[in-house]
Amino acid sequence: MKLVFRWYGEKHDTVTLEQIRQIPGVEGVVGALFDIPVGEVWPFEEIMKLKETVEKAGLKLEVIESVNVHEDIKLGLPTRDRYIENYKKTIRNLAKAGVKVVCYNFMPVFDWMRTDLHKKLPDGSETMEYDHRLIEGVTPDELIKRVKEGSQGFVLPGWEWDRLEKLRETFELYKNVDEEKLFENLVYFLERVIPVCEECDVKLAIHPDDPPWSIFGLPRIITNKENIERMLKAVDSPYNGITFCMGSLGANPENNIPEMIRYFGKMGRIHFAHVRNLKFTGEKSFYETAHPSFCGSHDLFEVMKAFHDIGYEGYIRPDHGRLIWGEKARPGYGLYDRALGATYILGLWEAIDKMKKRYC
């Protein structure tokens, strides 16, 4: 297991590389170029600037999250081939810079969804919440306004405002795209990009849909064991893998997280993992909690044991944390609670490892 920590760069993050460097066990950061418009080529020189900044702090840059997929590719428009060519060029540039894994998603319009970015918990901390009843009662425009107000000026990944300016137009285009068509468009993309990944030795890791069900009538296709396996078999290459986000998949209690880790892990298709916990509050509703098992609805001991059982040697990061101790930061991405999560993950891993050596 290689423990990493997401970082949004000097321009966009309240957390510094010096602070990340002091978290025990963290080897590197998960980064991106947030100022490059979606669909454009990431310049090699800009990638190297980011890498040099990270390495100067004593950390590694081997995972990118995310190289976003242009909406025209998801929609299957005639213009998609140009954007796919740009994506391939970006992968080649990342490979030249030593990047090993690229995370991406294939969610239409919204990369992720929450209805409250600042839910107050009884202990005074703030967290993010999803209440499906609120989704059913608002328009997409109203929700975007609510999220923008709740972002407190931070740029939220997947919610870049320039991408959402043409919201109504984009929704109109998706009226002709159901789950089967979206899946076909994903396969079209992978069939052209994966050969470049094989050539460059860069693993492509799709992020599950967050949450793993349809919102506003938009199709969702990476939500459970069955459709993930279908995607992997459609383009059957070890370079076509997944970012196993237990929080996204775990929002559906029907997804058996430890079993899925073992299944896809034995296939060698988990290239990157996000670990966090959440608390169910109703059907299709939850809020995010601190990482320990007793704080949420998932048993993180069993989750980490599943990773250990498959001999996982890939990258793993603590996912969203609460805002605690008065910290002002991007929702879900403050320093303190994620640092606590990192040490909890590391502690579970050490305990599981030593238990096996002692009793097996």
From Swiss-Prot:
Query: What InterPro entries has UniProt attached to this entry?
Result: Man_deHydtase (IPR004628), Xyl_isomerase-like_sf (IPR036237)
Q: What is the E.C. number?
A: 4.2.1.8
Which keywords annotate this record?
Iron, Lyase, Manganese
Q: Using the record, list the residue span of the signal peptide; answer none if the entry has no such feature.
A: none
Q: Care to name a GO molecular-function term for this sequence?
A: manganese ion binding
Spell out the disulfide connections.
none
BP GO terms, sorted:
D-glucuronate catabolic process
Pfam families xref list: UxuA
Which top-level enzyme class is recorded in the Swiss-Prot or TrEMBL entry?
Answer: lyase
Q: In which pathway does it act?
A: Carbohydrate metabolism; pentose and glucuronate interconversion
Q: Which cofactor does it need?
A: Fe(2+); Mn(2+)
Catalysed reaction equations from the record: D-mannonate = 2-dehydro-3-deoxy-D-gluconate + H2O
- Function, as annotated: Catalyzes the dehydration of D-mannonate.
The cross-references to NCBIfam families, in alphabetical order and at most eight, read:
PRK03906.1 (NF003027), uxuA (TIGR00695)
Record family assignment? Belongs to the mannonate dehydratase family.
- Record-given protein name: Mannonate dehydratase
Q: Which organism is it from?
A: Thermotoga maritima (strain ATCC 43589 / DSM 3109 / JCM 10099 / NBRC 100826 / MSB8)
Task: Identify the coding gene.
Answer: uxuA
